[in-house]
């Protein structure tokens, strides 16, 4: 390990065009699940100046008013909704339905998912991820609660943290791009963001005189949202997960029901990793899962603790396979993935919402007991 190094992560606000598309897709999913807990949903959203397109596949008894959902979601994000909304949702392929449905649910597709946890923060996430997402969450709060006047819904943040011997030591650089009114004084905006956002977000990692704080480094940021940038679901994968600091299998999360292992597998992998670290079985843990379409059990479950584990990785892998059910049915049941709450967790990282089932550390004692039983079996 290098003595000193810098790790960086970014986040975006709920009003960012890509994130707003994710929120629309998850609101469509939630609307289906409210009426039909067994709904099969794969919803994608493309939005640009003047037009929002909702497309994908459904198999459900629900009849959501998709256009109304789109318009309300855009308004809730802080924009006017003067858009033509086009809906192109069709029935799920019978081939996929046949592969997934059965006595035991099969995976909705093949794929690789990763989950991660580490000791660095209370959230058991890397410090740059936590700080970047706190900033974007506070940007939205400051706008909605009118703590800062003259700012818009669109925004981004990026945080670089300097580490010393594996420990977060100080904040090296903070970048914030915040949409604002044309007459907003830039010096006033900087002072408000430093006082009401940065100071509150970064209270537990040191900011010093050498910390670089860049506010709207491109200059003006008046035009935002879909009028400035085209938005698309699934284009903020690193923001949704671990900020690019952990491997990613490439599958997006939003707009997908629990049979889609891109989503359920990513949540379960995080759940397992967090419980391993919370149980004191490792300082750092990456969980990788792999699935084949139509098959219930994963084709691979692997644990990597970067040699920080109390037990070796093969031992921990065997333990988690005894404790956790990695089938789609098991993951949906354990993580409440047939409940309509997905729009609540799709902003500011899917793993920074303490109310989510996959963020609970309720398997720590079971993991410790299972490891002890495995030890006894081997002696």
Model segments located where?
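Conserved phosphate/anionic-ligand binding catalytic regions in large, soluble enzymes, centered on
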Residues: 12, 16-21, 105-121, 222-246, ...
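Glycine-rich anion/phosphate-binding loop at the beta-strand->alpha-helix junction
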Residues: 184-277
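Short, charge-patterned binding micro-sites
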Residues: 42-60, 293-297
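Glycine-rich, mobile lid/loop segments that gate access to catalytic sites or pores
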Residues: 8, 50, 68, 72-75, ...
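A short glycine-rich, hydrophobically flanked beta-strand micro-motif that places a catalytic Asp/Glu
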Residues: 41-43, 155-161, 211-215, 281-292
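Alpha-helical support elements that line or immediately flank enzyme active sites
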Residues: 10, 14-33, 121-137, 257-280
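Internal helix-turn-beta structural module
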Residues: 48, 284, 291-379
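N-terminal, positively charged regions that mediate nucleic acid binding
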Residues: 1-40, 47, 367-374
């Amino acid at each position: 390990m290098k003595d000193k190094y810098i790790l960086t992560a970014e986040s975006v606000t709920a009003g960012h065009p890509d994130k707003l598309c994710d929120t629309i897709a998850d609101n469509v999913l939630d609307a289906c699940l409210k009426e039909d807990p067994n709904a099969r949903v794969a919803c994608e959203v493309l939005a640009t100046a003047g037009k929002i397109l909702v497309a994908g596949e459904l198999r459900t008894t629900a009849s959501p008013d998709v256009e109304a959902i789109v318009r309300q979601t855009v308004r809730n994000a802080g924009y006017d909704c003067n858009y033509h909304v086009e809906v192109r949702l069709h029935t799920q392929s019978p081939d996929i339905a046949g592969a997934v449905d059965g006595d035991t649910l099969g995976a909705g597709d093949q794929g690789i998912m990763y989950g991660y946890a580490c000791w660095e923060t209370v959230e058991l996430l890397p410090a740059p991820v936590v700080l970047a997402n706190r900033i974007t969450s506070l940007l939205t709060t400051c706008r909605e609660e009118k703590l800062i006047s003259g700012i818009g819904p669109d925004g981004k943040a990026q945080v670089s943290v300097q580490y010393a011997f594996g420990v977060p030591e100080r904040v090296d650089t903070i970048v914030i791009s915040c949409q604002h009114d044309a007459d907003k004084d830039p010096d006033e905006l900087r002072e408000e963001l430093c006082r009401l956002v940065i100071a509150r977000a970064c209270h537990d990692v040191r900011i010093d005189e050498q910390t670089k704080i860049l506010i709207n480094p491109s200059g003006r940021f008046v035009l935002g949202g879909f009028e400035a940038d085209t938005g698309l679901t699934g284009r903020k994968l690193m923001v949704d997960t671990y900020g690019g600091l952990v491997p990613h299998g490439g599958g997006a999360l939003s707009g997908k029901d629990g049979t889609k292992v891109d989503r359920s597998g990513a949540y379960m992998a995080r759940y397992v990793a967090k419980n391993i670290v919370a149980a004191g079985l490792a300082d750092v843990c990456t969980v990788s899962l792999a699935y084949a379409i139509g098959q219930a059990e994963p084709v691979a479950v692997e644990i990597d603790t970067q040699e920080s584990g109390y037990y070796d990785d093969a031992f921990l892998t065997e333990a988690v396979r005894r404790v956790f059910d990695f089938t789609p049915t098991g993951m949906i049941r354990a993580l409440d993935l047939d409940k309509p709450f997905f729009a609540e967790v799709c902003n500011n990282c899917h793993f920074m919402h303490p109310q989510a089932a996959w963020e609970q550390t309720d398997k720590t004692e079971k993991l410790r007991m299972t490891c002890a039983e495995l030890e006894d079996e081997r002696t």
